[in-house]
Design a protein with these regions (language model features):
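Amphipathic alpha-helical elements of HEAT/ARM-like alpha-solenoid repeat scaffolds that form extended
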Residues: 75-82, 113-117
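Cytosolic regulatory protein-protein interaction regions
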Residues: 1-73, 84-99, 106
Length: 139
């Protein structure tokens, strides 16, 4: 009797490798898009409501969809999630980012909670997160 275990293990390993590579591409894309958000906001002084900013927020969300929820890659996504979240004006986009941040926060990373609190305070006040950090809000 012949076993296919080796072949099945190879296929499983190959599939895992493919998923990990796909996640790496998604993580990389989310960082590029977060960089564009910062470029347009800080250098070109576009408001959060700018269509360019909001399109990049949506593209960050699309890139995040390529990263498994609860996977190891997810813990590296605070910068793009926070960047997109602070600039998001669409309630559905905000909710999607908030949900994802809470999932990462559940992994026990307290700095994620602080970032989430700052992002929500930015939404509540309509102030930039930088203005809040320089002002009275410190987490």
């Amino acid at each position: 009797r012949h076993s296919n275990t080796g072949t099945e293990e190879d296929q499983t390993h190959s599939e895992r490798t493919r998923l990990e590579l796909q996640e790496m591409v998604s993580v990389n894309e989310s960082f590029h898009l977060a960089g564009l958000i910062h470029l347009h906001r800080r250098v070109f002084c576009l408001p959060s409501s700018s269509p360019v900013i909001q399109e990049n927020v949506k593209l960050v969300l699309k890139a995040l969809s390529g990263v498994r929820r609860g996977g190891t890659a997810e813990s590296s996504l605070l910068f793009p999630m926070f960047s997109a979240g602070c600039e998001a004006t669409d309630p559905a986009d905000r909710e999607a980012i908030l949900e994802r941040l809470k999932l990462v926060e559940g992994l026990g990373m307290t700095y994620v909670r602080n970032a989430r609190n700052l992002m929500e305070k930015s939404w509540e006040t309509g102030k930039s997160w930088e203005g809040l950090v320089k002002g009275e809000f410190l987490g």
